[in-house]
């Protein structure tokens, strides 16, 4: 056997063993292991092999992007029944953005599994954020094709959803959404907003709002609209609750 073929065979064997351990780690066994390997195959690796032992992961990345958006959207829709469409969109964007996907990928050491060409390897491709984010999406696409949406949901329930519950993305929410998220996380009860006062002429109206938790006042706020007053009340409530933590 020519040395190059021997080296490639040894390389493949090493990675097959790594993929076996990876599946054991996540508790999921692929029916079609070729899909799993394809998810981690960068185009640079395919370009350096004439016979193309695997397809690259770009098509799986395309599919995984859509599957990830769908599943995260469904989770947020169910978890935050009072959150507006705009806030849901903003929160979803923070969860599926590149830095977040890189964080998820690094948590499972995705970089160590990627099949790379020599040039990409030498230039640090294994740690490149865009590459890792793409691999995470490709893995979601492969998992969907191999086992369906239910298994994808179960995987995200272990890796992604807990971070939402821990408040990792609260910084992109408005004050009312942040307060709702904090209360839901602690299981403390129901939040209600009341407009206590409207004052001033019609062209310069001022509203005063109060937010309560289980009928206990948490914060007061004022603003030129009911929405602004509620946001300010929520901001004061958040400040108080965080001081107590």
From Swiss-Prot:
Enzyme class: hydrolase
Record-annotated DRBM domain positions: 174-243
Residues holding Mg(2+): 61, 134, 137
InterPro entries assigned to the protein according to its UniProt record, in alphabetical order: dsRBD_dom, RNase_III, RNase_III_dom, RNase_III_sf
Subcellular localization, as worded in the UniProt entry: Cytoplasm
Entry EC no(s): 3.1.26.3
Positions in coiled-coil regions: none
Classification via Pfam families: dsrm, Ribonucleas_3_3
One GO molecular-function entry: double-stranded RNA binding
Alphabetical keyword list: Cytoplasm, Endonuclease, Hydrolase, Magnesium, Metal-binding, mRNA processing, Nuclease, RNA-binding, rRNA processing, rRNA-binding, tRNA processing
Cofactor field: Mg(2+)
Protein's job: Digests double-stranded RNA. Involved in the processing of primary rRNA transcript to yield the immediate precursors to the large and small rRNAs (23S and 16S). Processes some mRNAs, and tRNAs when they are encoded in the rRNA operon. Processes pre-crRNA and tracrRNA of type II CRISPR loci if present in the organism.
Assembly with partners or alone: Homodimer.
Name this protein carries in UniProt: Ribonuclease 3
Taxonomic lineage from the root: Bacteria, Bacillati, Bacillota, Bacilli, Bacillales
Gene symbol of the encoding locus: rnc
């Amino acid at each position: 056997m020519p040395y190059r073929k021997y080296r490639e065979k040894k390389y493949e064997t090493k990675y097959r063993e790594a993929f076996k351990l990876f599946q054991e780690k996540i508790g999921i066994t692929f029916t079609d292991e070729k899909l799993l390997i394809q998810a981690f195959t960068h185009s640079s690796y395919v370009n350096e092999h004439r016979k193309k032992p695997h397809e690259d992961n770009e098509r799986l990345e395309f599919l995984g992007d859509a599957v990830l958006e769908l599943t995260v959207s469904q989770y947020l829709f169910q978890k935050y029944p009072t959150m507006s469409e705009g806030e849901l969109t903003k929160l979803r964007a923070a969860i599926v953005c590149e830095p977040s996907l890189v964080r998820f990928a690094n948590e499972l050491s995705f970089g160590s599994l990627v099949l790379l060409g020599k040039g990409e390897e030498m230039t640090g491709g294994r740690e490149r954020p865009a590459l890792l984010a793409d691999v995470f999406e490709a893995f979601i696409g492969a998992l969907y094709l191999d086992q369906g949406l239910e298994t994808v949901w179960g995987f995200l329930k272990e890796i992604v959803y807990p971070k939402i519950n821990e408040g990792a993305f609260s910084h992109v929410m408005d004050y009312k959404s942040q307060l709702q998220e904090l209360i839901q996380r602690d299981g403390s009860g129901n939040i209600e907003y009341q407009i206590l006062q409207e004052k001033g002429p019609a062209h310069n109206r001022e509203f005063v709002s109060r937010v309560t938790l289980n009928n206990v006042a948490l914060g007061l706020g004022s603003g030129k609209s009911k929405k602004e007053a509620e946001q300010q009340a929520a901001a004061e409530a958040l400040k108080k609750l965080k001081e107590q933590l």
